Amino acid sequence: MMEVLVLGSGVVGLTSAWYLAQAGHDVTVVDRQPRGAEETSFANAGQISYGYSSPWAAPGIPQKALKWMLEKHAPLKIQPSLDPALLSWMGKMLLNCQLSRYQVNKSRMLAIANYSRECLKALNQTYSLDYQGRQRGTLQVFRDEKQLTAIEKDMQLLAQSGVRFELLNVAQCLTHEPGLAPVQEKLVGGLWLPDDETGDCYLFCQQLTELAKQQGVRFHFDCHIQQLVCEGKKIIGVQTDLGLLKADAYVVALGSYSTSLLKPLGIEIPVYPVKGYSLTLPIIDEKFAPQSTVMDETYKVALTRFSDRIRVAGTAELAGFDPAIPEARKATIEMVARDLFPHGGDFAKGQFWTGFRPMTPDGTPIIGATPYTNLYTNTGHGTLGWTMACGSASILADVLTHGESPLSRLGLDLFRYPKAS
């Protein structure tokens, strides 16, 4: 058994702490917020999207990005910048848009997602967590025939990875999401992913925090991390505003903020804060609300059903750590919600939110060892932190405890990036 410090209490940090504790370690979580999941995990899309696990870096994206720059409601926005970190990250992302790399990255992501599904299933079977979860799948809807044609390559990868799916016509889409009936003329079909789930990530995190406390995990909230202190290639402590915290091993699970903490150690990981937005609406008419998750392929916006709320989330914006919520981004999210489910939610009571998704240029998270003997990472999950959290945490616990995991062959640690090591 080792004493382990987990830095970060988002869904990835909390699940890391949980699985490390289950492996027999003495775990402490450190975070600057007053409780867990107060940042990127707070109001995300609510999707647990095993079948939708796919990198943003895909064939055709460079051409689409140029077109999106001229569109009012584009799914990708890039704020002009000469930031070297952004330019480097974008260059790496463009390289990963090649078909061969896309296929490798997507298959890797699907493997993590499928493993995570089994981990979350086992957790729920034991503890019956109540986070307004539903197991009714994801319906990816298409507005034009080109999208239907383009999805065929993804379907091949899904089949190879053992992910269940079904290509649907519009009438079949309505059997899963009858609330789309008033706008069915806007659709040409959909892809049904029956094994996907939904749930409020924030509620999950609060319940997991309490479970972890019962298992002996300690939490230092309102504690600001300043730097990692090392001797040679070993970490000897974490300097915080409350003093130096020491352990046998350290896990960096700080999302987009992992990069700045690791850089002084000579570790440069290509994780960039890709800004996302959400809108949460009270449901006013259940028959016109989504039943699970509807993913609008055109705008890359997800509409997810909680018990009495609709969570609308989307947009990828490259703008650094700017916390502002521009009116234009609000307009895009609200437009899609009104376009597909105009009578389902109370738009007058909608609440907007933004968060910084920690995204790698290849879409795959960075899980595992580092050049420092007792330092580990679990970060870079992008839009799929909720989807991959349990599986990633289990992989991390295996690597920290045994030196490897069943998925080590995928090359998930930072050593896949030459400059990082």
Curated annotation (Swiss-Prot):
EC number assigned by the record: 1.4.99.-
Gene3D superfamilies referenced in this protein's UniProt entry, alphabetically: D-Amino Acid Oxidase, subunit A, domain 2 (3.30.9.10), FAD/NAD(P)-binding domain (3.50.50.60)
Role this protein plays: Oxidative deamination of D-amino acids.
This protein's name: D-amino acid dehydrogenase
Gene Ontology BP terms: D-alanine catabolic process
Cited Pfam families: DAO (PF01266)
Cofactor entry: FAD
